[in-house]
UniProtKB/Swiss-Prot annotation:
Name under which the protein is recorded: Mediator of RNA polymerase II transcription subunit 2
Function: Component of the Mediator complex, a coactivator involved in the regulated transcription of nearly all RNA polymerase II-dependent genes. Mediator functions as a bridge to convey information from gene-specific regulatory proteins to the basal RNA polymerase II transcription machinery. The Mediator complex, having a compact conformation in its free form, is recruited to promoters by direct interactions with regulatory proteins and serves for the assembly of a functional preinitiation complex with RNA polymerase II and the general transcription factors.
Keyword Ligase: no
InterPro entries: Mediator_Med2_fun
Remarks, miscellaneous: Present with 10785 molecules/cell in log phase SD medium.
Annotated Low complexity bias: 143-152, 318-365
Modified positions (Phosphoserine) in chain numbering: S6, S208
Family: Belongs to the mediator complex subunit 2 family.
Length: 431
């Protein structure tokens, strides 16, 4: 059986070959396209041989394509499928790689956004901190300026002289402080005098001229009581003195045939004077005086409560009369201190009667103390007041423990040494 092929098929085949050649020139060359072109070429050749075979009249002829062509076509088809598999693998790997890159890009973008956010927050915090510091600095500057203005205003007010408003108050304060100072001085002097007289009376000794002069000087200057702190004296340089006793040989000197401490057989009593007790008594008197200073217009009412306080204040003369009347008390304490025309008469008695009369020619020392009891000690010994310039006591015999000028002369010291040979320069000590 002979099969005739129409010429249309051959024309179609030629046109297809031309289109393939035109398409081949337009495509991009790579493995896949080259393999695909080879497959198409082998297939086209096999189809041409098959058509030539069909044209022949003998039907027993073999197929139009040979075995080698079939093998080549098979290899090309396998290669094409391998290339497609490799392409699929590459595409999958590329997609995964792209996905990984996309995830990494998103993470980086997220981190960048977070970093920018943190940076913005830190910048905001820094700005807020700077604003707070600036505000605090401004507040401190304003406070310092206000303080400086207040200080300047205070200084200006302090330097200003407003006599119309401040003069009466200052005058009143000055008068009150002056009265308090006078009262304090009189009470301190009276307490000091009473303390010394009481100690002398209890020890049974008479007053020497030294003691009389000392009492008068303390009455004349009541402010010296504040400088009688015995514990502040440094007596370490005097080897003969200690805290419990004194050497009575320095007090044996008498003036104008008067009696000293040893003439009354009571010299040993002065070795037992307790300095701390005297100091405590003085401090108690001063403290009681200071506490009583604030209660200037108040008096203690005892027994019948009949007390009269009269205060008359004038320009240069202030008379303070305080009277307290009790049942069994008829003694008065009169302390006369002339200071700027101030007369202070204090008559007090809490069942305690004290009479002290200090005159320049007084020869009797009377002390009256007691609670409903009157103890009067009259020292009838002759006492003579020695007029010593500056209220200084007469020199006394210091004994053998003190060096004199003759002792220095006995040392044969060359006071003219100038220190030229490395010796001590004594020229400045030459007497």
């Amino acid at each position: 059986m002979v099969v005739q092929n129409s010429p249309v098929s051959s024309v179609h085949t030629a046109n297809f070959s031309e289109r393939g050649s035109n398409t081949r020139t337009m495509t991009y060359k790579n493995k896949l396209t080259v393999c695909f072109d080879d497959i198409l070429k082998v297939g086209a050749e096999m189809m041409m041989q098959q058509q030539l075979k069909n044209v022949q009249l003998d039907s027993y002829l073999v197929n139009g394509f040979s075995q080698s062509q079939q093998k080549l076509l098979k290899e090309k088809v396998k290669l094409f499928h391998g290339i497609l598999d490799d392409l699929e693998t590459s595409l999958s790997q590329s997609s995964s790689y792209l996905e990984t890159l996309t995830a990494l890009g998103k993470e980086k973008e997220k981190e960048r956004e977070e970093a920018e956010k943190k940076r913005a927050e830190q910048e905001n915090m820094r700005k807020v901190r700077e604003q707070e510091e600036l505000k605090k600095r401004q507040e401190l500057e304003e406070a310092s300026q206000q303080q400086q203005l207040q200080q300047n205003s205070k200084e200006k007010n302090g330097l200003g002289l407003n006599f119309s408003t401040t003069a009466p108050a200052n005058t009143t304060d000055a008068n009150g402080s002056k009265e308090n100072y006078q009262e304090l001085g009189s009470l301190q002097s009276s307490s000091q005098t009473q303390l010394e007289n009481a100690n002398a009376a209890n020890n049974g000794a008479a007053f020497s001229p030294l003691t009389t002069t000392r009492i008068q000087s303390q009455q004349a200057q009541p402010s010296d009581v504040m400088f009688n702190d015995l514990n502040s004296m440094d007596i370490s340089m005097f080897s003969g003195l200690d805290s419990t006793g004194f050497d009575s040989t320095a007090f044996n000197a008498t003036v104008d045939e008067t009696k000293g401490f040893d003439d009354n057989d009571s010299g040993n009593n002065y070795n037992d004077i307790n300095i701390s007790s005297i100091e405590n008594n003085i401090n108690n008197n001063i403290n009681s005086t200071k506490n009583g200073k604030d209660n200037n217009n108040e008096s203690n009412k005892n027994n019948n409560g009949d007390e009269k306080n009269k205060n008359n204040n004038e320009d240069n003369e202030n008379n303070n009369n305080s009277s307290e009347k009790n049942n069994n008390n008829n003694n008065n304490n009169n302390n006369n201190n002339d200071d700027n025309g101030n007369n202070n008469n204090n008559n007090s008695g809490n069942d305690n009667n004290n009479t002290t009369n200090n005159d320049s020619n007084n020869k009797n020392n009377s002390i009256t103390t007691g609670n409903d009891n009157e103890n009067i000690v009259n020292n009838d010994l002759p006492t003579t007041v020695v007029s010593n310039p500056g209220d200084n006591p007469p020199p006394a015999d210091n004994g053998e423990e003190y060096l004199t000028l003759n002792d220095f002369n006995d040392l044969n010291i060359d006071w003219s040494t100038t220190g030229d040979n490395g010796e001590l320069d004594l020229s400045g000590f030459n007497i």
